[in-house]
Amino acid sequence: MSRVGKSPIALQGAEVALSDERITVKGPLGSISQNANRLVKVVNDNGTLKFEPADESREANAMSGTMRALVANMVHGVTKGFERKLTLVGVGYRAQAQGDKLNLSLGFSHPVVHQMPEGVKAETPSQTEIVIKGIDKQKVGQVAAEVRGYRPPEPYKGKGVRYANEVVILKETKKK
């Protein structure tokens, strides 16, 4: 059995609704649901969730660990939430959150407007910092990657949009 799949999930402040095809987790920040895999049996046992492969195949064994990780992320998302911090490095690079849109000035001849998907919010504590928050880990990471993709850090001066903990290794310029 998968090592990840063996460990149970503690449902601290979250409620889980299990059906044959969906797993729905509700918490103080909202609710999120996921398709259940037919190869994995999910058991709710007094505030803990346990995942077991439905048969002895390698695929069922692997999917038990995958489902456990996905549901653990759902529980974490509805109780504490996920956030990703981005930093803008460069002269004139600015960000401003307006409702469900993120306005970016990244040195192009036009401003870049990024539409936030449902369930994801952007905050700008300062003009060069962006905090992306939400309950779905995949959506938060995807939005952060899309925003970073508008102007990734370039290797000579390091200008661009980068994750807050990202280390950009700078190249040396050519010498004559």
Curated annotation (Swiss-Prot):
Protein name as it appears in the record: Large ribosomal subunit protein uL6
GO BP, sorted A to Z: cytoplasmic translation
Assembly and interaction partners: Part of the 50S ribosomal subunit.
Pfam family, one: Ribosomal_L6
PROSITE patterns linked to this entry: RIBOSOMAL_L6_1
UniProt family annotation: Belongs to the universal ribosomal protein uL6 family.
Coiled coil: none
Alphabetical keyword list: Ribonucleoprotein, Ribosomal protein, RNA-binding, rRNA-binding
Gene: rplF
Job of this protein: This protein binds to the 23S rRNA, and is important in its secondary structure. It is located near the subunit interface in the base of the L7/L12 stalk, and near the tRNA binding site of the peptidyltransferase center.
One cellular component (GO) term of this entry: cytosolic large ribosomal subunit
Signal peptide annotation: none
InterPro entries xrefs: Ribosomal_uL6-like (IPR000702), Ribosomal_uL6-like_a/b-dom_sf (IPR036789), Ribosomal_uL6_a/b-dom (IPR020040), Ribosomal_uL6_bac-type (IPR019906), Ribosomal_uL6_CS (IPR002358)
Top-level taxon in the UniProt lineage: Bacteria
MF term (GO), any: structural constituent of ribosome
Organism: Paraburkholderia phymatum (strain DSM 17167 / CIP 108236 / LMG 21445 / STM815) (Burkholderia phymatum)
Record carries keyword Disulfide bond: no
